[in-house]
């Protein structure tokens, strides 16, 4: 999804480097970033130029997958463009403020800024759809699946009929699956797959085959699940860690123990703590079915250790979520004080 700022470039911005970076942003974000980073003493620019510089630099970093570690830069753009009058730049400023908060783990504040960005959008286009998509991800993160699916549907209504509709369709399908609406999930995943096949997007095709395998597994239709996970492996290869774990679990459910053992062990050195927990639990199930009690005990003991670690991580994440609102209010207060100091 791509929207250029150049279509609404302010006549007050004359800096040729800013205008050049703006024109390159969607097609060559790495070049845009290089240009922006070459600008010396941006603080000496006129206020309009500083605001555009802050917006473009945040955008370029985000597009180049550079972490947005604080909001001091984008706040310059937010303060300049405001939140009263509809404009693409104002919407973009609040969107990237939301993206910054999202990366910092402040989901509640990210939602607030995404909603502001939606309100400020002057047109219904791909950028608005992207805001809805990111808003949906925040709701999904907080397990507000009913609200998340509404945001995904808004994105889909904008993108319907185009190649980008794959993303909200996949989001809708995932929300249906999380709400135990398995048949609806299958319908939306199939729609997304049909679109990906038309576009011949191999990475999305492989991902959607995997999605369908998981949906059929939830329905306990392991024959269909195996059909789709095998297709995913054909596209993504046996180095695809999560796909191989899914294949192993499906093989276990089909009681094909040798195949299950092979796929559980395929990429064991690459597994994170969650993957290793799945691995040890699966190997325990296999050993138990074979009557190999010593091996079963070793695997279940390893699984329990990992489970305790995962539970500790989960408890901390829940604590962070409970603290989130308090932290954000404090952060907002400090920002307000900082702004007052700059004005006075």
Spans of model-derived segments:
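Hydrophobic positions within repeat-based interaction scaffolds
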Residues: 13-26, 30-33, 41, 68-71, ...
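Structural signature of alpha-solenoid helical repeat junctions
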Residues: 12, 47-52, 69, 89, ...
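Amphipathic alpha-helical segments of tetratricopeptide repeats
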Residues: 37-42, 75-82, 115-120, 153-157, ...
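"A position-specific structural signal for the A-helix of alpha-solenoid helical repeats
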Residues: 19, 56, 89, 96, ...
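N-terminal leader/linker segments that initiate helical-solenoid repeat arrays
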Residues: 8-71, 75, 88
